[in-house]
Each structure stands twice: as C-alpha cells, then as structure tokens.
Amino acid sequence: MPSDILEPRGVPTPSHFHEDIRITPEKQFGFMKNNPMPEGGVDRSSNLPTSSWTSDSYQLSQQSSLSGALPSFIPNGRTTTNDTHWESSLFSSSLSDLFSRKLRLPRSDKLAFMSANREEEPSESLEEMEAQTIGNLLPDEDDLFAEVVGEGVHKSRANGGDDLDDCDLFSSVGGMELDGDVFSSVSQRDGKRGSNVSTVAEHPQGEILSRILFVRNVDSSIEDCELGVLFKQFGDVRALHTAGKNRGFIMVSYYDIRAAQKAARALHGRLLRGRKLDIRYSIPKENPKENSSEGALWVNNLDSSISNEELHGIFSSYGEIREVRRTMHENSQVYIEFFDVRKAKVALQGLNGLEVAGRQLKLAPTCPEGTSFWPQFASDDGEGGLPKMAFNNLSSAHMGRHFPGILASTSIDGGSIRGMHNSVGSPMNSFIERHQSLDVPIGLPPSARVISASKPVGLQEFGNPFDNSKTGIQSMPNLHPHFPDYLDNFASGSPYKSSTTFSEMVSDGQKANEGFMMSNVRGVGVDGFNGGVIGSPINQGSHRGNLNLWSNSNSQQHNQSSGMMWPNSPSRVNGVPSQRIPPVTAFSRASPLMVNMASSPVHHHIGSAPVLNSPFWDRRQAYVAESPESSGFHLGSPGSMGFPGSSPSHPMDFGSHKVFSHVGGNRMEANSKNAVLRSSRQMPHLFTGRSPMLSVSGSFDLPNERYRNLSHRRSESNSSNAEKKLYELDVDRILRGEDSRTTLMIKNIPNKYTSKMLLAAIDEYCKGTYDFLYLPIDFKNKCNVGYAFINLIEPENIVPFYKAFNGKKWEKFNSEKVASLAYGRIQGKSALIAHFQNSSLMNEDKRCRPILFHTAGPNAGDQEPFPMGSNIRSRPGKHRTNSIENYTNFSSSSDNRDEPANGNDSM
C-alpha cells in the first residue's frame, strides 16, 4: 500500500505518484519498501507481477521502535515522519551484519535509486541514518585518538613488534612521508612540519627525559629575547631555536638535564600571552651536537677492584654525577652520566687514558638521555675501546644514542625490535633509518644493515669486517631499504636464517664489490623461484640474499603506466608486457655496471620502489642479446664507484663476469651498438634514499672512453681533496708553530650582514687582533655573497678567533647558518693590499672596499684608508655613479644565496 503523507492540517491523504520506483529486495536494505500505486489504481510501469520483485518473507515493522524517526525517500520531496515501514530484518541482524550489508550495497545501486529523484535531494544519507541507529555506542574521535596516542601505544610496545605495527599510526614508512620532514606522533597529529625532530608523544611527567624541550602553542609575536629570559631562569640555555615560532613551536636546549626538567614542570600548561604552553621532551635527529656523544661516558678497561664509590669520587671532581652503573660481565664496563653535558666533555678530555689501578681508562661518549636502559655487553673488543653489545631486547632509539654508528629506526622503541612487514610474517628484524638520524659506519656493507634479533649479535671491530678496501662501499647515508615479500628463494621474506649472526652477514657483504646479479626479473629464477628482486652477491648460494633497495609496500603510490624496476608482478617488467621480454636470469657475461652516485635529494617516498619510465630500454631494440661479442651493459661513465664517499678503486659491479657463469640460454646483454639510454632525465633513480641518486649518462660508453673518463674523474677528485686539505685550518698545528698563515676565510655568513655588523660581531671577541677585513658585496642582489676574508696580526690570534666563531650560529636575523673557517689563498696584509689596490673595487663606494686597520701606536684598532693603485681596472658595464645606490639597500635582500664550498674560490 502507498505511504501516508501528512498534509499541513494533519489529515493523511494518499500520495499520487507519476513514476514508479521499483527496487529489488537486495537493493533496499535500510530503505523504506515502497509499493506505489499509479493514478487510477492501475500499474502502468511494468508488466511483471509484484511477486517477481517483492519478497513475501519480509515483514514490515513500525519505525516507532527507533529512538528517532528516520525519513523515507518520497519522489515529491516531502518526508514522512509517521507510519514509515522498515524491514524487520534490519533489527534482527547484528551490528556487524548491518555494516556488512551496507558494504555489499554497490555504489551503482545507490546512484540508480537516486536517479529517480534527480531534482530532489534526500534529507539524510545512508551514513547519517546508520549513525542515528548506532547512537553513541562508539566513542567520539577525540576520546579514541587520545586512547590510541596515550595508553594504546604503550600497551602495544609492551606486547611486542606485531602489536607495534598495528598501533604505529603515524609511521612514515608506509607512505605517509611529507616532503621528508615529518614529526612523529605529536607533530603529525598537530599538523606541524619542517623540523628535524622526533618528538616523544607523552606528557613531561613520566616520559623519556631529554635536555631538549619541544614547546608548542607559542605566540608568534613574542620576541626571542623574551623567550630567552623565560627559559634561562631555569638554567643555562644551550640553544633556542625559534625558526618555527610563526607556526607556533620552538625548541629549547639545555646543558643540564635538571634545568630541562625544571622548565618542563614549571612551564607546562602555563599561560603565555593567553596561550597555554605545551612542553614535551624531544630527541633531536640531525643535529650532531645535540644528538649523541654528550652527557654520559662509557668507562672501559677498568680494574674490577675499583668500586662505584671510588669511580664516583674520581669523576665527580669534574661535575655532578647523575648515575654510575656497572655491567655484570667479566670484563665489566661502567656507565657514568653527568647532569651537565659540558662536565662530561671535560671529564672525557681529562680522564681518558688515566692510569687507575695499573690500567689505563678508556672512555667513550654516549647519550642515553635519562632512560633506564642498560645494555648487556658480550665482551671487550680486546683493544680497550668500545665494547661489543648484544642486540636482543634492544630499543633502536637507545642503540642509536649509545652507538651512533649503528643504524636505528626511530619508529622502534619500547624494548622490542619491530619485525619486518611481509606476506607471511617473517621473524626477520631490521634496523632501518627513516629520517637521516644515524648512518652506517664507513665501510659497512649493505647486507650488514640487516640484523637478526633471534640471536645476540656483537659489534665487530672496525678493522677487518668494515674494511673499505674489501667492501668497496663506504658510508651509505640516507639509503632507506625496505624488504619485499620475497628475497631470493625464501617465501618467508627473510634472506637470512634466524640464527645467522651479524658477523656472517658482514662476511657476505665483503663480496659486494665483486658484483650483484639482477635475478628473477620475470619467470623462473636461478632457484626456480618467481619474484623480482636484486638478488644475492656472487660466490654464495641462494640461501642468503643481499640488500634489497626497495619494497612494494607502497605499491599504490606508483604509476603503473610507467612501471617499477623489477616489480613482483609476473606480467610486466618496466611497464612492458611480459610476452615481449623472454625470462631473464642474470647479466652473466657483462662487464661491471658502473653507477655514479650523486648527492642530490630523491623526492619519492622512503621505502617506495622508484618509478621507471619505459624508455629505459628502447622497446624497438632487441632486449636479449646472445652474441658473446657483446661489450657489456654499462650505465654511463664511471665516476666514484659505489655509494657516496666510496673509494674509486673499488667499483660496485652489477652483472659481473662471475655472476652465474654456468647459466646459459636466457641472459640479458646489451651491445654498446644498440643499447641506448634516452637521457638521464628520463631515467629515474634506481635507488631509494634521501641523498643518493644515480647519475647516468645519455648513452652507453665504449670501454676505452669509459676508463679514460674514470681516470680523469679520479684525478679531479684527488686534486680537489688535496686542495681542500691545503686550506683546512688545524689549531694543533698553529699551537705547535707549524703553520704561520694568518689570512682566513669566514664562510656561511648570513647575506643580510653588512661590514659594520660583521665588525661588531668580531670585536666582541677579538678586537685589535686583526688588520684587514673584506666582505664581498653582490651588487646585483644588493647583499653580501656569504663569505668574508680577515687577516689576523699573529698566527696565535687565530686560536681564540676559531673558538669564538667556528661551528657557531650567527646571532642576527634568526639565521640557521653555522660559521666555518678556512685559510685564504692569498696570505698576509701586504699581499692582500697588492691584490685589491688595482681592482675594480677601488671604483666602488668606500663602504664596499676592503678595510685596513692600524696595528700600532695611539690609533691602533682604528681604520686606515686603503691605498689606491695606479692601474685601477674598471668593472664592465658598471659606472661609479651607481655604486652608492647599489650599496645602500643591500642589507634588505634575501638570505637565500649559495656559499662557496671551500676557502679557495675568491682569494
């Protein structure tokens, strides 16, 4: 029967439909089941009987059982609030059934229903009706979010790695990375970006202590000096970072952890200009001065007869001790933490090598930042240096702070190592650096980045296993490997057995420079396994896999039209249909694949497989070459082989002559005559990571040209390194009287600085110790060029000048630039005068010229006129009349210019 509609006077009248709306029972869950009658009582819209689309088993019930009336959809746009019939099955079903039915309702069905009412909008959607039906059974978003961030995360940490995966809502590994600078936990929730800080998402009371405070909800109108006064009342402030003040947050770093605690307790929740401050302890990631090697010391090679009280007495003479702890092993080490990081530095310098009870103390810095973590050492390294330590039940964040050379993931904490994410739940664990916080020690092979947590593993000595001459791969910063579902022939995704030790993996990694094979591109690989990875290094069986540089965890982010490099899909390789490419096993007879690694940033998400355009291999060319005369597959000209910083004499071979030489038939080889890369622009980057990228030439080089280029680039690199060393400033050599140079280059000066500002900054520490200063000006941009030259009167004057400026930030303009010093090319006051007195600078305004100072007599320290030469050159296209105008406003220009790389460019 038709639905009743209330007229304005409350008298029910039958509704008259001009069109019928027929919906099959499968499509009307949650809707009123209309059974309309046309005018005259004749059904003219369908020849089918009603029984063909209406189920007799559905019993109608009154909507009065609901707490609120749910409207029916009526073609004339009015809604009924009484006597609306609903399916009784809606209330006989469980809540899960209700949602499952809703999910089974196709979107097209809903659109089909709404198409009959195109001109009228329904008063409420299906989601709104469900929300009314459910009521307040579920908590609101704020309560749920607070529970997840607060208790939920801590419970998951206690339960182990699997729970941590479920609750790691803010991990950037899964594609939530935003431009490479993402706060964890708290910062992502509040939408603040742009700081290189991993912030602990806990209240200041009871969280991991740190000397650095992350202060949110700061009024951007507050002056820096006011903030300095506010925080200095609790102790000496090491640094006050206010670059994010306009976004509502600042960073405060203290020397003494007690001062940070006092500030957090006193200021958390305090109103400052109408805003309630929110203060959290923070752990920095990219600032080495605030990240590690300060605050605490490891004491090694200590006689066991020395008690903790005696040690406390020895070390407390340098400063107040926060804690003294000792390991329980035979060769015990002692951990001593100072409240003040400055005291720890002094103790390290004063006590390292001190003989106590017939043994020389070996001290090493570490920075646990107030945690209760205490690592268990396996044994001494035999050299009295850093102890070896076990990795079981070890938080990676703590590992990174104790031993900065060990790669740690900032997403791992709470005493358990996060398991690798793969389809079969492999127990393999990995330490993967996400945000450039820590790097692998120099020479660490790629396979050493994978660590099995099922067996305690010791740190190897930094001699043999990490020898650069054996691995050919030096410091690999910013590589972010994530492991795919399959590595070689292991369906579990684990390239190592659970009992494989770190040393075994390191020994495997020593063969990395002999070559990699690209196995299992498509079809059946060497071991009959179907997958797509970069496989094992040579001279070993398939039971171990090498480092895989990408995963398919973020496959939804990749453009499938262009394809990925070695995707696991068996149907496509590099976006090319599989039937076009025969199965390929390895580059077996190819010469080494030379890879140039540059330091430009890669902007795709960490952990994502790089997108590779199809022009990488010309589809019109032959993909498989069987000619034994093939000259090899050479990507570009070789520069410095391997990763950044690697030795040029140890190239990283891809497709070595030795790679599976026994395999015949299906091999991929590219003849230099027909294998062409389109361009380095079209060729995407093969390796993930934030810093390294591939630099590939536009075509394959012939062998002679390749080695000629290699030799040329080697010589360039060697000469550049030698030149840098020539201008490096060594304070020890100055103190020993071995270096008598006096002219320095000051680099990384903020571009808004004027000569007057620079003089004021220098005179604050070193007034009267210099006789020449020159700050070059860029007249086009009306600002300084970022560096200056100064000549000290005596070489000994360099030492206090170095201590005052080198490595320090500039005070003005809130600049993040850090000053650095190097020797100038031209040395001495007389040589500098001779260099400039005939230059075009003499035609410029006096304020743009070099400045000379009296060094003796009553006028010592005052400026003296710069002598003019007899042959002054003119600057092309520039008249002297414009020089003053160019100079007057140069201090207001942008602070975004590039500085030179070393101290030998201008002078």
UniProtKB/Swiss-Prot annotation:
Domain RRM: 211-284, 295-368
Disruption phenotype: Early flowering.
One Pfam match: RRM_2
Biased composition (Polar residues): 44-54, 883-894
Entry keyword set: Meiosis, Repeat, RNA-binding
GO biological process entries: meiotic cell cycle; positive regulation of growth; positive regulation of meiotic nuclear division
Spans annotated as Disordered: 28-58, 856-907
GO function term, MF aspect, one: mRNA binding
Annotated function: Probable RNA-binding protein that plays a role in meiosis and vegetative growth.
PANTHER family to which the protein is assigned, alphabetical: RNA RECOGNITION MOTIF-CONTAINING
Name of this protein: Protein MEI2-like 4
Protein species of origin: Arabidopsis thaliana
Lineage: Eukaryota, Viridiplantae, Streptophyta, Embryophyta, Tracheophyta
